[in-house]
């Protein structure tokens, strides 16, 4: 992952992903696009392939580093995700499957224990598997840091 932060409260982030296989792979080894990694506007694993190139890009405002362990910090962001996937079918890769999604959201660090992320994701590409673009979705992720557990 790459992040360029020209000021303490502005960041540009890129998260490239890639996979190459010279032969067909079982489904559990294929690159999957959709949901929280790349393709946030789509269902998990809506597209999968043996060969893939993907990029998740974000512009972030704010910082997720609280002033103290009891404070909170908020970061807003907008994103564009894209992925291109190919399947090896008898030695021929054929044409690429492609998806793009865009959106924005808010991340919050709550003390030194919790992180909350909420985003609105919009599918841009029409996928044959969905019969179109699909629906706009709201994604919510809550993470709790269990260790180290400190007494206050």
Residue ranges and their predicted role:
Residues 122-136:
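Outer-membrane beta-barrel translocator/channel fold
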Residues 50, 93-100, 107-109, 131:
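Short amphipathic alpha-helix initiation/capping segments at coil-to-helix junctions
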Residues 52-56, 99-103, 137:
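Transmembrane beta-barrel architecture of outer-membrane proteins
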Residues 76-81, 97-101, 122:
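Small/polar glycine-rich anion-binding or flexible loop at a beta-alpha turn
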Residues 69, 85-89, 95-97, 101-103, ...:
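C-terminal soluble interaction/assembly domains
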Residues 100-123:
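A short, conserved beta-to-alpha structural element at the edge of catalytic cores
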Residues 1-88, 128-131, 140-145, 151-152:
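C-terminal outer-membrane beta-barrel translocator/porin domains of Gram-negative envelope proteins
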């Amino acid at each position: 992952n790459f992040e360029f932060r020209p000021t303490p409260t502005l960041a540009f982030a890129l998260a490239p992903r890639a996979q190459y296989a010279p032969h067909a792979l079982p489904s559990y080894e294929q690159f999957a696009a959709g949901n929280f990694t790349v393709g946030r506007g789509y269902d998990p694993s809506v597209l999968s392939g043996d060969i893939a190139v993907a990029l998740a890009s974000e512009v972030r405002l704010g910082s997720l580093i609280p002033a103290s362990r009891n404070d909170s910090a908020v970061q807003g962001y907008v994103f564009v995700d894209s992925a291109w996937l190919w399947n090896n079918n008898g030695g021929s890769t054929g044409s690429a499957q492609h998806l793009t999604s865009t959106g924005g959201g808010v991340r919050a660090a709550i003390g030194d224990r919790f992180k909350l992320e909420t985003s609105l994701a919009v599918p841009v590409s029409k996928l044959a598997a969905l019969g179109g673009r699909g629906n706009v979705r709201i994604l919510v992720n809550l993470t709790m840091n269990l260790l180290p557990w400190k007494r206050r």
